[in-house]
Amino acid sequence: LDCTGRSCDNGRCKIYNLDFPNVITVRNELLPAGDWEQNIPCDLNDTAWFSEVDTSGGAVFFASGVFYYFLTEQVKALVQGMADAFPGGVLVFDAANRTAVRMIAKTWLKSAKIKDVGAYFAVSDAPKEIGAWDSRLRVTSRGYMLGYNDLKDPSVSGLFRFLARVGDGVMKMQIVRIKFVGR
């Protein structure tokens, strides 16, 4: 259960946790909503949840580890719908290339009897690939590990440096930021 919203809370943010109803039930038991928080049971692909979000003070959405389970067309439709509903808003999420998604999805794809891994959301160059979906999207990305850490720092271990180069280099793991702008 992700708590990014709580760790970023400045006491003025409205925090919405969205997940399937059974997950929200567990969340309500383990992490009851705080004063500025609302737990919304939903399927992200059903955009009815858009109307429950108060964007009067702006909107920043985090989707951590979510889109690996979505088809590319589902992510595209969701992002375009969010651009319609939340102009001026920002969506931040993690992504990786096809090789990494294949590795991530290896076990759950077998149990779900899914054969077409290629249909699942993966990107190598987020600004170019996602930016082409819609002119209202301003897309930037940084390496998942290298984008936020200085590998020249002597406190960074050799193992971390190796994993960072494989993750960010070979697998194109990245943190993607999409700003929704008007037409």
Give the positions of each predicted feature.
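Alpha-helical subdomain
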Residues: L1-R183
